[in-house]
Amino acid sequence: MSKKVVKVIKLQIPAGKANPAPPIGPALGAAGVNIMAFCKEFNAKTQAMAGDVLPTLITVYHDKSFSFITKKPPVAELLKKAKGIAKGSGVPNRDKVAKITRSEARKIAEEKIQDMNAADLEMATNIVLGTARSMGIDLIKE
């Protein structure tokens, strides 16, 4: 028999750096989960990915136990890492912060496609390019 799910919590947590401070502590505390047990388990599982922000789905069960699934970093984080920028543009239609080619966007889409709502690689590439555009990263011809 499966456990009864009480709550599903979505958080973005830096890999290997979970701690009881907000936003993790209040979200898990409200659900009655042992916060330190989650932090230790999460940090142990994500130690190798240090530096990345990971979207995490935490499933809380009726007996206050939990399980979690980590996904690939958000497309915006992957773009910032690939282009070596700290953040996107504040005014993306006027100030461009970097340039990207379609093949670079395709590489990011290949890495992220399992977490995306896209039917194929071409659609995933277009999603990555849309995110890049909204961050002030310009598409250039190859």
Swiss-Prot record:
GO terms under cellular component: cytosolic large ribosomal subunit
Role description: Forms part of the ribosomal stalk which helps the ribosome interact with GTP-bound translation factors.
Superkingdom of origin organism: Bacteria
Keywords recorded for this protein, A-Z: Methylation, Ribonucleoprotein, Ribosomal protein, RNA-binding, rRNA-binding
Post-translational modification: One or more lysine residues are methylated.
Subunit structure: Part of the ribosomal stalk of the 50S ribosomal subunit. Interacts with L10 and the large rRNA to form the base of the stalk. L10 forms an elongated spine to which L12 dimers bind in a sequential fashion forming a multimeric L10(L12)X complex.
Protein name according to UniProt: Large ribosomal subunit protein uL11
Gene this protein is translated from: rplK
One GO MF term: large ribosomal subunit rRNA binding
Annotated source species: Protochlamydia amoebophila (strain UWE25)
Similarity-based family: Belongs to the universal ribosomal protein uL11 family.
